[in-house]
Structures are given as structure tokens and as C-alpha cells.
């Protein structure tokens, strides 16, 4: 009888060990996924920053262009 109980206990312990091993593997996979997603997020943020800088340069260029056009229009008004 006690041998039977010991075998049942051994089976439960083995099942627990197997479950722990599987959970450890899952944790490692999740860590790898998290690292990859973190890297993707950093790249996306860097790309966003570059796009924002490019947009600001375009706005600055447009403002300069508009100022030059206003200056030229002002000179044309003076000529007329």
C-alpha cells in the first residue's frame, strides 16, 4: 500500500517537474519575444523621430519660400 502511494507521489512530483520545465521554456520564449518587440519599438521610435525632423525641415523650407515670394510680390507692387 505505501509503495503504491510512493509511486503516486513520484508520478505527481515528476509531473510537477515537467510542468516547471515547460513553463521555464515558455518564459524564455516570452523573454525573447519581449526583447524583439522592444527592439522593434526602438526602431519605430527612431524612424518617427527622423520623420518628425524631416517634416520640420520641410515646414522651415516652406516658410522661407513663402517669405521670399512675399518679398518678390512686394517688389512687384513697388514697380507698378
From Swiss-Prot:
Query: Does the record's keyword annotation contain Translocase?
Result: no
List the record's Gene Ontology CC terms alphabetically: cytoplasm
**Biological role stated in the UniProt entry:** Non-essential, abundant cell division factor that is required for proper Z-ring formation. It is recruited early to the divisome by direct interaction with FtsZ, stimulating Z-ring assembly and thereby promoting cell division earlier in the cell cycle. Its recruitment to the Z-ring requires functional FtsA or ZipA.
* Statement: the UniProt record of this protein carries the keyword Cytoplasm: yes
Give the residues annotated as coiled coil.
Answer: 3-80
Could you identify this protein by its name? Cell division protein ZapB
Q: Name one GO biological process term.
A: FtsZ-dependent cytokinesis
Q: Which key words are in the record? A: Cell cycle, Cell division, Coiled coil, Cytoplasm, Septation
Among Gene3D superfamilies, the record links this protein to: 1.20.5.340
Subunit text: Homodimer. The ends of the coiled-coil dimer bind to each other, forming polymers. Interacts with FtsZ.
Q: Which InterPro entries match?
A: Cell_div_ZapB
Q: Where is the composition biased (Basic and acidic residues)?
A: 49-60
Spell out the Pfam families in the cross-references.
ZapB (PF06005)
Family classification: Belongs to the ZapB family.
Instruction: Tell me the segments the record calls region Disordered.
Output: 41-60
Location in the cell reads:
Cytoplasm
Amino acid at each position: 500500500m505505501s509503495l503504491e502511494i510512493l509511486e503516486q507521489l513520484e508520478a505527481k512530483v515528476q509531473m510537477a517537474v515537467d510542468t516547471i520545465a515547460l513553463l521555464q521554456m515558455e518564459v524564455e520564449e516570452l523573454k525573447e519575444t519581449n526583447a524583439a518587440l522592444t527592439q522593434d519599438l526602438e526602431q519605430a521610435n527612431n524612424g518617427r523621430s527622423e520623420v518628425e525632423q524631416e517634416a520640420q525641415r520641410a515646414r522651415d523650407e516652406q516658410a522661407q519660400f513663402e517669405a521670399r515670394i512675399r518679398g518678390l510680390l512686394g517688389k512687384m507692387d513697388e514697380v507698378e
